[in-house]
C-alpha cells in the first residue's frame, strides 16, 4: 500500500534534523513515496522560514497531489499566517482526497479550514515525534496502526477506557441528557449521534476565539488536549470557552492527554482532576476523559470536522465516524 506523502513545515523550525531524516527514512521503508517540501528545513527566528515561506509551503502541499500532507512538527507560527492561506485551494485538495495530518499548532490550520470551508482534516502525528525516534525505539504500535488505517481508508473509529473516577460521572450524565433521543442503560450507557467532531490543542483553539478562524460548531463533540500547561492554566482556558458560550453549545466534551506540567506545594491538592470536577459542575453535558490523543506516543487519529457518533457504556467509550 504505497502512498504519496508530502512533508512540509508550516509552524516551528525543525530542531532535530536527525529525527526528521529518520522519519523520512521510516516512511520510505514502509513503501511510501515521500516528497519533502523545498522549505521543510528552512529557519527564520523560531519559525520554519518567514511567514511568506511557510504560506508557500502550505500551498505547495495543497497543490502536490499527494495522498497525505504531513507536518514535520508543531511549535508555533500558524496563527500568524491564517489570513494568507488560500482556503479554496486547500478545500479543492481535500475534496480530491488529500488528507492533511498534524497536531499541536496545526490546530490553528484545522480550525481555520473548518471555519472557512467545512473541510475535514486529521488530528494525528507529526513526522519527527511519531516516526523520527532513534533505533531500537519504534513508532508506537497504536499510532502506527491508526496511521495505516487512515492511509488504507479503513479507519472507522477509536475506543478507549476512562479512569475509574469517570464511572459515576458518566452515570450522572444520563439523567442530564435523557430528554434527548439516545440509548440509555445501567452504568451510564448512552449514545450521541450525528455530531461534528472538532477541537485539538486547547491553547491554540482558545487563542482563536473571537476570530473568523474559530469554528462555529453547535451540538458538536469537542475534544481537547495540551502539553506543558499547569492545571490552573487549563482551567482558565476552559473558563474562557465556557464564558464565551462555546462549551454550552456542545453535546459532549472529550478530554485527551494533558502532559508535562509540574505541580507545586502552593497548589495544595489542586490538580488536573480538580479541573475535571470543576468543569463537570459547570456544564450540563458529558465530560469524558483519557482519550488517547495529545502530545503522547500512543494516540489515535481523529477527523476534525467530520460527523461522528459517541457511544459510552460505563467506563468504555467509542467514537465512530466511518
Q: Could you tell me what each predicted segment is?
A:
Residues 1-22, 159, 165-181, 318:
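N-terminal amphipathic/basic leader segments beginning at the initiator methionine
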Residues 68-84, 103:
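N-terminal glycine-rich "phosphate-gripper" loop used for MgATP/nucleotide binding
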Residues 210-265:
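Internal helical hairpin/lid segments
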Residues 49-54, 87, 236-241, 267-275:
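Charged helix-capping and loop-helix junction motifs
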Residues 120-203:
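Conserved anion/nucleotide-ligand pocket segment
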Residues 87-112, 116, 120-127, 286:
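Short, acidic/small-residue loops that bind anionic groups at enzyme active sites
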Residues 255-322:
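ATP/nucleoside-binding phosphotransfer catalytic cores, i.e., glycine-rich phosphate-binding loops
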Residues 1-65:
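ATP/NTP phosphate-donor binding region
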Amino acid at each position: 500500500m504505497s502512498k504519496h506523502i508530502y512533508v512540509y513545515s508550516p509552524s516551528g523550525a525543525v530542531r532535530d534534523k536527525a529525527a526528521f531524516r529518520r522519519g523520512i527514512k521510516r516512511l520510505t521503508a514502509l513503501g511510501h513515496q515521500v516528497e519533502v517540501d523545498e522549505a521543510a528545513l528552512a529557519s527564520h527566528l523560531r519559525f520554519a522560514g518567514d511567514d511568506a515561506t511557510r504560506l508557500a509551503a502550505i500551498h505547495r502541499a495543497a497543490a502536490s497531489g499527494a495522498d497525505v500532507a504531513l507536518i514535520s512538527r508543531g511549535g508555533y507560527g500558524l496563527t500568524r499566517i491564517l489570513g494568507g492561506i488560500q482556503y479554496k485551494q486547500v478545500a479543492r485538495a481535500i475534496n480530491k482526497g488529500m488528507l492533511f495530518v498534524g497536531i499541536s499548532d496545526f490546530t490553528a490550520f484545522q480550525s481555520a479550514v473548518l471555519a472557512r470551508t467545512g473541510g475535514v482534516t486529521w488530528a494525528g502525528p507529526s513526522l519527527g515525534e511519531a516516526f523520527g525516534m532513534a533505533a531500537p525505539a519504534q513508532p508506537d504500535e497504536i499510532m502506527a496502526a491508526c496511521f495505516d488505517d487512515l492511509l488504507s481508508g479503513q479507519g472507522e473509529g477509536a475506543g478507549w477506557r476512562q479512569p475509574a473516577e469517570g464511572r459515576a460521572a458518566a452515570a450522572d450524565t444520563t439523567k442530564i441528557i435523557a430528554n434527548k433521543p439516545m440509548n440509555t442503560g445501567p452504568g451510564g450507557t448512552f449514545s450521541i449521534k450525528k455530531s461534528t467532531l472538532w477541537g485539538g490543542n486547547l491553547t491554540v483553539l482558545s487563542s482563536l476565539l473571537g476570530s473568523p478562524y474559530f469554528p462555529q460548531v453547535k451540538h458538536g463533540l469537542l475534544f481537547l488536549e495540551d502539553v506543558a500547561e499547569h492545571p490552573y492554566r487549563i482551567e482558565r482556558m476552559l473558563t474562557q470557552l465556557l464564558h464565551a458560550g462555546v462549551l454550552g453549545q456542545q453535546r459532549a466534551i472529550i478530554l485527551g492527554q494533558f502532559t508535562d506540567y509540574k505541580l507545586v506545594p502552593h497548589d495544595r491538592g489542586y490538580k488536573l482532576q480538580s479541573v475535571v470536577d470543576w468543569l463537570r459542575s459547570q456544564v450540563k453535558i458529558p465530560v469524558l476523559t483519557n482519550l488517547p490523543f495529545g502530545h503522547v506516543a500512543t494516540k489515535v487519529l481523529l477527523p476534525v470536522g467530520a460527523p461522528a457518533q459517541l457511544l459510552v457504556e460505563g467506563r468504555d467509550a467509542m467514537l465512530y465516524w466511518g
